[in-house]
Amino acid sequence: DGVYYVAYELTILNDAPRDATMTAIETIADDEHGAVVSIADQAQIAANTLLAGGTPTGTAEIPVGRTAIVVVRAGYPSLEAIPATFTHRVIATFAPPTPDGPRLASMYPDEVAQIGGFVTTSTETPLAIGAPVAGDGWFANNSLESAALNAHSDVIIPVGGRITGAERYAIDFLRIDVATMTSTDGDPALNESYLAFDQPLLAVADATVVRVVSTLPDVTPRQIGTIDVVDEATGNHVVLDLGGGVLAMY
């Protein structure tokens, strides 16, 4: 789409004794004294926020003592337009104190602006890759271009003691009949009815196959399969090493 994306997640703890509502998040080049690069309004924040523990909220509110995770997918027209470093100004309002609330709740301001979330972007040139499929009728979606949380960007889980966007760069490829705009020919409860079924997959670049799992049973379309251990969460898959620490997983 001609856009360069910077993808990350902001973790914001409300340690105040009053519920908070994020009204804007400014991205600021360099440090807090730099130029404002972009502003996310309250509606955009709400569409991309979930609470720690994996619950999408649909709001920009952070209850007392809870941590919100704001998924950021910032698009830029060129590599040169991306700041080498940037931070954020989170602007939030607090709900009115309640009579039975903590003693210091009434002393908090009604609105605050907090600087945080410092980011250093990579200086590496992004790896150019090819398509993992061939032929016509392929539709790529649920990726970085989504304006709101999707089936991948809301997969925020703890890995190795850190909150991780486990499917941050995932893309869904769906094969459709352009004339009918459908993805199946037959019973949609059967895998073999899907136009993408049994189509060949291609390496997206010169690579080494470093992992193959093919022993798990197929799942029923549009249903979440039973997972006994975390290692089964991905299902059957292939991992390619593209070099330079870059992996591709199918």
Model feature map: region roles:
Residues 23-36:
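Extended low-complexity, serine/threonine- and proline-enriched intrinsically disordered segments
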Residues 1-14:
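Early extracytoplasmic/domain-onset interaction patches
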Residues 11-12, 74, 209:
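Hydrophobic beta-strand positions in extracellular immunoglobulin-like domains
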Residues 3-5, 20, 35-204:
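Polar/charged, compositionally biased leader and regulatory segments
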Residues 196, 208-250:
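Zn2+-dependent peptidoglycan hydrolase active-site motif and core
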